[in-house]
């Protein structure tokens, strides 16, 4: 291994790590890449965590994972299994349906999903699919800076001295996706509009909020996106 590479030679996950440029390109919330990257962790009971990654090929990355998982793993219904996904795009409605079917078949498995972007979030089928996933017990959250840092440390073959990676884009971009995910889960109309530039495939964000958004979206989310001013208590 090159001496300038960060993870140690004895790191068992080294061969399964992705390149730094891949991580930055796949998980930038403003870059509208067509491909999907899935970083995942699997933990059986008190055993060590298994980490790996895959991408969409002839089918979506989520389907690839579930097919590979069921083909290679021996299931013991008495042992709890926790799975964590870090996805560059949120699941489409068909993948959401397949995930619910997968979890129904394996009740000892729990799933948490962290996403960097919402996939065609204006489409009602995709919105309903995510909403039903949450209602079925799946944790879905937008990746924060801490998740980006965690993925960098555990999934990326980072250069020596650069183990403390933090994204260079504004936190507001993340909070805009957080805002829209709340709309989806609460069954509210879309408030975030995303358009892409054909020249560089970067997303352009705009907001269109209604009274229902101000009434039902958590106050701290509205403050974080600058939509309302925080309360000030005078003494």
Swiss-Prot record:
CDD domains: cytidine_deaminase. It holds the Pfam family APOBEC4_like. It catalyses: a cytidine in mRNA + H2O + H(+) = a uridine in mRNA + NH4(+); cytidine(6666) in apoB mRNA + H2O + H(+) = uridine(6666) in apoB mRNA + NH4(+). Binds 1 Zn(2+) ion per subunit. One of its GO terms (biological process) is negative regulation of nuclear-transcribed mRNA catabolic process, nonsense-mediated decay. InterPro entries: APOBEC/CMP_deaminase_Zn-bd, APOBEC1, APOBEC_Cyt_Deaminase, CMP_dCMP_dom, Cytidine_deaminase-like. It comes from the Eukaryota. Its cofactor is Zn(2+). Zn(2+) binds at residues 60, 92, 95. It is an enzyme of class 3 (hydrolase). GO terms for molecular function: cytidine deaminase activity; mRNA 3'-UTR AU-rich region binding; RNA binding; zinc ion binding. The active site is at residue 62. Belongs to the cytidine and deoxycytidylate deaminase family. This is C->U-editing enzyme APOBEC-1. It comes from Monodelphis domestica (Gray short-tailed opossum). The lineage of its organism: Eukaryota, Metazoa, Chordata, Craniata, Vertebrata.
């Amino acid at each position: 291994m090159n001496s300038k590479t960060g993870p140690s030679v004895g790191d068992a996950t080294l061969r399964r790590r992705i390149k730094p440029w891949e991580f930055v390109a796949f998980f930038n919330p403003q870059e509208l890449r067509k491909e999907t990257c899935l970083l995942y962790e699997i933990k059986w009971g008190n055993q060590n965590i298994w980490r790996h990654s895959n991408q969409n090929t002839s089918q979506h990355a989520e389907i690839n994972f579930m097919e590979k998982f069921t083909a290679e793993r021996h299931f013991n219904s008495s042992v709890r299994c926790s799975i964590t996904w870090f996805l560059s795009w949120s699941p489409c409605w068909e993948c959401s349906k397949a995930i619910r079917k997968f979890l129904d078949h394996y009740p000892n498995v729990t799933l948490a999903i962290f996403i960097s972007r919402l996939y065609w979030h204006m489409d009602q089928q995709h919105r309903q699919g995510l909403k039903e996933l949450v209602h079925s017990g799946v944790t879905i959250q937008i990746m924060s800076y801490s998740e980006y840092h965690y993925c960098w440390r555990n999934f990326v073959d980072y250069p020596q001295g650069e183990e403390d990676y933090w994204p260079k884009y504004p936190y507001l971009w993340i909070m805009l996706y957080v805002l829209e995910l709340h709309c989806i889960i609460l069954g509210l109309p879309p408030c975030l509009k995303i358009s892409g530039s054909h020249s560089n495939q970067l997303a352009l964000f705009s907001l269109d909020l209604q009274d229902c958004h101000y009434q039902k979206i958590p106050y701290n989310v509205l403050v974080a996106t600058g939509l309302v001013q925080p309360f000030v208590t005078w003494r």
